Amino acid sequence: MALLSYEGWLFFLRWFHFLSGITWIGLLYYFNFVQTPFFAETDPPVRSGAVQKLVPRALWWFRWGAMLTFITGWLIILHRISPGGFFVGTYGWAILLGGIIGTLMWANVWFVIWPKQKMVIQNAIDVAAGKAANPAAAAAGQRAG
């Protein structure tokens, strides 16, 4: 297989999709199984420092892992669609269903989790600077996971 061909392009797309998906879902496991229990048992000053410095970095990789997985997934689907070919069997429909579910997951990251986490991070920065706490930040943190 020549890497500078149509099949080579699909090869790279699949690998970028695979690696970015591992990044995205791996960080999701980190948030759920490592960070959340850690925050539950830490002292407030430690938690505040982690929210200000660690969480934004982890969320950056989480968000962009989701974005790259989303983009490469739809590029793979668009490259595989051909007149009368992709949706003839169950394979194409199964991949399309996966793409729709992945799109919903991506939208949750970008339009639910990230805006709520921005509020939580900004609240931690404001409180550390001596400003008043945002009462909506606690609820946003619960909603965003």
Predicted features along the sequence, with ranges:
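Polytopic transmembrane helical bundles with strong interfacial aromatic enrichment
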Residues: 1-145
